[in-house]
Amino acid sequence: IGLSLHYLEISKAEARRRQEMSRDLELVRERNRVLGFISKYDELTGLLNLRGFTEQTKKFCSSEINQRAYIICGDLDHLKEINDTWGHPAGNFALQSVARILGGCLRSQDTLARVGGDEFLILLNCEEENFQDIFRKRIKDACTVFNAESDKPFLVEISLGIAEFRPKPDTDTQEIIALADKELYEAKKHRRKSVRRPES
């Protein structure tokens, strides 16, 4: 009986040890999941960050081979003016609003990321003719609707640069982003001089 009790105590101790190990492993897994999320997502907007966007782009170029695709650079106009005039909470609100506006104009399979202070990237495929003109108008109209409903003293407006490409596994997406960014730079020359809401 004494020997049986001894083995019973060992079995109980072993069961407790295994339960603790299982709990510890689950905590490690959860921590890794959280760290993985943080490493790929932007905290302010909940969108992918540059690392997450780069990973999605690699997968996209390996699966959507030779389809007509686009990388779009979107930029919140006059973020510095918003921050300097109304404070950083207003700037954060404007950035979150851009995320919602852009997201509302995209499909569920499209990729949207915030990759810098005021810069966003979009990756999508579309065979629609005149896509670039259609998309620019869609974003402009969405901003118009947003600003009409907003009670903020500033306007939220977005400049766009769009680059078309045919994805392949060896596509240099940094080169495509650079082309879109160059067009964005030209587009920003034509933005309004201030985002201060006109007095009625």
Residue ranges and their predicted role:
Residues 36, 40, 49-70, 77-107, ...:
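Conserved long alpha-helical elements within nucleotide-processing catalytic cores of c-di-GMP signaling
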Residues 71, 120, 158-162:
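A structural signal for short, well-ordered beta-strand segments
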Residues 84, 88, 133, 165-200:
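Catalytic-core segments of nucleotide cyclases and related cyclic-nucleotide turnover enzymes
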Residues 114, 143-159, 192-197:
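Catalytic core regions of nucleotide second-messenger enzymes
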Residues 104-109, 140-153, 186:
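Short catalytic/binding micro-motifs of nucleotide second-messenger systems
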Residues 3-43, 51-61, 111-113:
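Signal-transducing coiled-coil linker helices
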Residues 6, 84, 123-127, 165-166:
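Residue-level recognition of strand-loop junctions within catalytic nucleotide-signaling folds
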